[in-house]
Amino acid sequence: MKYVSINPTKLEGQVKIPPSKSVCHRALICASLSSGVSNITNVDFSEDIEATCEALKSLGVIIEKGNNSLSIKGNSNLYVKKPNVHCFQSGSTLRFLIPLAATLGEEITFTGEGKLVERPLNVYYDIFKSQKIYYKTESGKLPLTINGKLKSGDYRVRGDVSSQFVTGLLFALPLLSGDSKIEITTELESKSYVDITIDMLGKFGVCVDGSSYREFIIKGNQTYKEVDCNIEGDFSQVAFWLVMGALGKGITCMGLDTDSLQGDRIIVHILKDMGVEIEEKENCIEVNPSKTTGVVIDVSQCPDLVPVLAALASVSHGTTEIINAARLRIKESDRLKAITSELNKIGAEVIEKEDSLIIHGKENLKGGNVTSWKDHRIAMALAAVSSKCTEPLVIEGAECVKKSYPGFWEDFRSLGGEIDEWSVGK
């Protein structure tokens, strides 16, 4: 267990934002389904990206790692090279690859760690039942064994659990011999993630018609082509630095595509609504020290931003209400419960509701001991508000940032952050 003690300091300077995990997962999978070699550059080898690489190797894909790059020799005819696909704690890896594995008609078992073991997969179980695909699971939890062949046709999928199920099907269905349609039976949340998927499919030569978000039309017998791509910066990660810059002395965030399809790009507009001074320039965003005010924030399309927005709201003038956040309960932790618990430990006033948070802002927080709940976004959100603490902030389980942002603490230091690190036990 790693601990980090942060001495309250206002950060300033420039930081290069790590590449988007969401975009990289999709590029990796599309490249793996082509019949040629694709080169992917600007890759950050977070635990989740490593999980997808290892899982694809289990399906016969050849992947060579370079210095922040990947060379992928695709295999348009995937096969079960290893019958066990371990997804570590990556929900994207698991949910994206299950449908692809189901196109093979061979027995394969998916395993995982931590909260991933419990994250819901009912959307796929319903499909398996309707198509008579054999599956075995432990009361709905991992490990999951499947044996059968996915068929083209009409699919009915809930849109309010996770858009990852839609993405998983969109990767697999173009490979089948017949045409398919995915009908979304509830409001589709996190639409932007599906936009990223369809955009990436298009770059690799695969066409999907889904402009209405109510149904997606997928032609069968499509072929993925090899493509070289550079991974853009991650807006879910820039959120932490924008908040720290607003609470500090100003930060310039580099390596961003300000025309990105990433839904978390809305962080810029949310922060402006709260009073943050932000300027978007070509490939970068500058944030200046700002006084912030509470607002109502609908996070149905940007759930990953909730922890850091809650942290900022806790030191903003007035009251902030974060609504439509029920899905936060089935992430790496119950994020509504986790961020409420930890912010309140250090003097915040956060009220947890079933699907929302009400936050009454304070001038400062007191600091003290908090835990990450083994959740990377909780750890980074707490660090983001450390400059408003009157005493050092000690975060237990700080190593969890490796899941998405291995260089987070190094970047924190580079901007003037004062931290001490130590480990206890293994």
Swiss-Prot record:
Disulfide bonds: none annotated. Transmembrane segments: none annotated. One of its GO terms (cellular component) is cytoplasm. The active site is at residue 304. It holds the Pfam family EPSP_synthase. It is found in: Cytoplasm. 3-phosphoshikimate binds at residues 21-22, 26, 162-164, 190, 304, 331. Phosphoenolpyruvate binds at residues 21, 91, 119, 164, 335, 377, 403. InterPro entries: Enolpyruvate_Tfrase_dom (IPR001986), Enolpyruvate_Tfrase_sf (IPR036968), EPSP_synthase (IPR006264), EPSP_synthase_CS (IPR023193), RNA3'P_cycl/enolpyr_Trfase_a/b (IPR013792). Its EC number is 2.5.1.19. Monomer. NCBIfam families: aroA (TIGR01356). PANTHER family: AROM/DEHYDROQUINATE SYNTHASE (PTHR21090), PENTAFUNCTIONAL AROM POLYPEPTIDE (PTHR21090:SF5). This is 3-phosphoshikimate 1-carboxyvinyltransferase. The lineage of its organism: Bacteria, Bacillati, Bacillota, Clostridia, Eubacteriales.
